[in-house]
A protein has these predicted regions:
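Thiamine diphosphate
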Residues: 1-174, 179, 189, 313, ...
């Protein structure tokens, strides 16, 4: 497999999947808090003007209203920037799960993807904040095809749970701001709950998710130039680790793993992956690249902050090389 995906780039399209699902008859309903143009859900609202409500700059109320729509038979989709979704929305998300009123969330501009707005707007604890809420699935897609497929699958699963009389789960999608490739592998499919092997190797496993999967792909290419064979894995289901896919590659690499994420190292994707591997008894040594306990800064582009915080492809390749030395 090759990284890069080829072709024109476009933003990840969960809203396009919502439009598709509504056209197919699913009772999707949008609840927004002022930034629907930035999150992309405005396209759904334009297509279905009788299927949305705008609550203003009131993210906590947005999630609570969404839970209310769940109780009367809709499939609610709430949207805002990641920072406000995981802070102001945390208690309502917990109450929605407790009340058997799950919601689907699109929380965008995560991590350093919101470079220009500075530290106050940069969500760096989003995995940690949401992953431990019961009955809540955290998803960090890394390409447009994956985002579309998994959002459509989430809506379908929501409807199936309701029809079967099950309580169901909330699905929280964390997406970036800057462009994603359409696919990392041409013709790829995205089965629910599964990771995707982007590149196969034997010496070390590189795991990424969301916007920083690109760094893992590039790191794999840098290592190949040095004769190091790296497996690159996309891990979108952050708190539902796909051990069936990941474990054999970790064992093949004699336990050498490097993870990268646009998130604090503490309680992030890498920490949850390592915990899951340890819990099943898989011996491994992991180096986690992430934000080291500080806040972000204002910058023109996310790339400037990735360089400042050691989250580049070269940083990941160097970390992998250290595990091999």
């Amino acid at each position: 497999p090759t990284g890069g995906g080829g072709g024109k780039k476009k933003p990840p399209p969960p809203p396009l999947a919502a439009i598709q699902a509504a056209q197919e008859g699913y009772p999707v309903f949008s609840v927004s808090s002022d930034v629907q143009g930035s999150t992309g859900i405005a396209s759904f609202q334009k297509s279905f003007p009788d299927r949305f409500v705008e609550v203003g700059i009131a993210e906590s109320n947005m999630v609570s209203v969404g839970a209310g729509y769940a109780k009367i038979g809709f499939i609610p989709i709430v949207d805002t920037f990641g920072q406000f979704g995981v802070t102001k929305g945390n208690l309502p998300l917990t109450m929605a799960a407790l009340s058997q009123a799950p919601v689907i969330a699109i929380f965008s501009h995560v991590g350093f993807q919101d470079a220009a707005d500075g530290a106050s707007h940069q969500a760096t604890t989003y995995f940690a904040a949401i992953s431990s809420i019961p009955h809540t699935v955290v998803i960090a897609p890394s390409c447009s095809g994956e985002a579309h497929a998994l959002m459509h699958a989430a809506i379908k699963r929501y409807a199936e749970d309701r029809q079967a009389g099950r309580d169901g789960e909330s699905y929280v999608f964390f997406v970036g701001r800057e462009n994603y490739p359409i696919h990392w592998i041409d013709g790829a499919t995205y089965p629910w709950g599964r990771s995707q092997v982007i590149r196969e190797g034997a010496d070390v496993v590189l795991v990424g998710c969301g916007p920083l999967l690109s760094k893992a792909v590039q790191a794999g290419e840098l290592l190949a130039e040095k004769g190091v064979s790296a497996t690159v894995i996309s891990n979108p289901f952050v708190n539902r680790v796909d051990l069936e896919t990941i474990t054999p590659w970790v064992e093949k690499a004699q336990g050498r793993v490097v993870t990268i994420e646009d998130h604090q190292v503490v309680c992030g994707m890498g920490a949850q992956l390592s915990h899951a591997l340890s819990d099943q008894g898989t011996r491994h040594q992991v180096t986690t690249l992430g934000i080291g306990g500080g806040f972000g800064q204002s910058a023109y582009m996310a790339e400037h902050l990735y360089e400042r915080h050691g989250l580049t492809a070269k940083d990941m390749a160097d970390a992998a090389q250290k595990l091999l030395d």
